[in-house]
């Protein structure tokens, strides 16, 4: 599913946006072998404690309170704004005048964290000192204009690309520094839904969804069937189990990809423009499905007392999806976060760029240039 690491070695051979499928029939997220290792050029910018944070069932609420755990260094709480960073090389303060870099508190540790990440492809600088977090247990969104590196962020999370400088942490562990075996295991934490569902054309729907279980577990066929049918039921495709991908509508393929992304019970689910190609009604229905499954996974995490809460990250251009679905919003522009925070804070932001983008208005700092 991931393709190879040629883009990291070859620079401008990799597109800045779009799914890293590589073939017409990509494998599921955890199916590809780890690429050749390469450490990030820059050292990690900050130390991270590894204490366990409090789970919701330990605090009596749905969210662990800020500062209530040993991992408080990873909890997103803003006491005061840090000094404004200098613009990247070759850019001016005017280029980043709308970037306040303000991060409103989420009260949760970050499941994924980008620390001063720089990434270029040839002469094209995509990430330019990116600092961004995905709070654990929330549905986060990365939104922003086209070509700002949103899909590049996904590839960094799973170790398909490595920073030229900076670090990427998953549950406090540095992805660029992981040995091959650890990287391969880390990828199993992730489920990934591409724009088109990324199904194998030669397999029916049932076998597509069952593939990760058969490939990466020793479960019996009876166990596989129980899991697959449960996931197909969640996305409303129980009656389509024998259909081939070319017999499915675009929306059905996305839901099938969603079911397959869930079968290994990932801690982190990544959605790369899941609403692409869908009409407004089906986009709204998909958003409701994302929220429903996230709620179900949160309840399951409480019952099982899992170490980590389920974290969803949705990349989208659709403002309505962001308004309906997001718990937390990161607004990315020019390779850096303009502002980030819980959706209520972001939807009420006084930043002219944030207001323009989240209101889908023509008047504002963002132009056709």
Locate each region found by the language model:
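Helix-to-loop junction immediately C-terminal to a conserved catalytic motif
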Residues: 158
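Conserved ABC ATPase "signature" region
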Residues: 173-174, 221-239, 291
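ABC ATPase NBD coupling module
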Residues: 175-191, 221, 346-349
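Conserved ABC ATPase signature
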Residues: 244-248, 252
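Conserved catalytic motifs of ABC-family nucleotide-binding domains
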Residues: 265
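Catalytic Walker B motif of ABC-type/P-loop ATPase nucleotide-binding domains
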Residues: 269-272
């Amino acid at each position: 599913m991931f393709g190879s690491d040629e883009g990291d070695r070859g620079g401008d051979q990799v597109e800045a946006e779009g799914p890293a499928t590589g073939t017409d029939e990509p494998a599921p997220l955890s199916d590809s072998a780890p690429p050749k290792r390469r450490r990030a050029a820059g050292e990690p910018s900050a130390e991270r404690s590894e204490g366990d944070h409090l789970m919701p069932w330990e605090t009596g609420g749905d969210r662990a309170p800020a500062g209530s755990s040993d991992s408080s260094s990873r909890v997103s709480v803003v006491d005061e704004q840090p000094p404004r960073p200098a613009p990247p090389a070759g850019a001016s303060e005017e280029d980043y005048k709308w970037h306040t870099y303000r991060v409103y508190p989420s009260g949760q540790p970050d499941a994924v964290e980008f620390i001063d990440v720089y990434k270029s492809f040839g002469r094209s600088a995509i990430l330019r000192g990116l600092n961004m977090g995905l709070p654990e247990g929330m549905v986060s969104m990365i939104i922003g204009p086209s070509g700002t590196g949103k899909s590049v962020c996904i590839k960094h999370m799973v170790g398909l690309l490595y920073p030229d400088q900076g670090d990427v942490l998953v549950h406090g562990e540095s992805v660029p520094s992981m040995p091959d075996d650890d990287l391969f295991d880390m990828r199993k934490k992730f489920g990934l839904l591409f724009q088109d569902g990324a199904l194998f054309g030669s397999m029916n729907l049932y076998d597509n969804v069952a593939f990760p279980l058969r490939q990466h577990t020793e479960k019996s066929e009876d166990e596989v069937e129980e899991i697959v049918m449960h996931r197909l039921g969640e996305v409303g495709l129980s009656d389509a189990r024998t259909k081939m991908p070319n017999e499915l509508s675009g929306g059905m393929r996305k839901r099938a990809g969603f079911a397959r992304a869930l079968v290994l019970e990932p801690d982190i689910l990544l959605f790369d423009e899941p609403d692409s190609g869908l009409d407004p009604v089906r986009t709204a229905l998909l958003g409701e499905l994302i929220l429903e499954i996230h709620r179900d996974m949160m309840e399951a995490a409480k019952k099982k007392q899992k170490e980590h809460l389920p974290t969803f990250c949705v990349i989208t251009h659709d403002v309505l999806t962001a308004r309906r679905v997001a718990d937390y919003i990161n607004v990315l522009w020019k390779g850096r976060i303009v502002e980030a925070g819980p959706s209520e804070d972001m939807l009420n932001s006084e930043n002219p760029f944030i207001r323009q983008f989240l209101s889908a208005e023509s008047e504002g700092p963002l132009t056709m240039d």
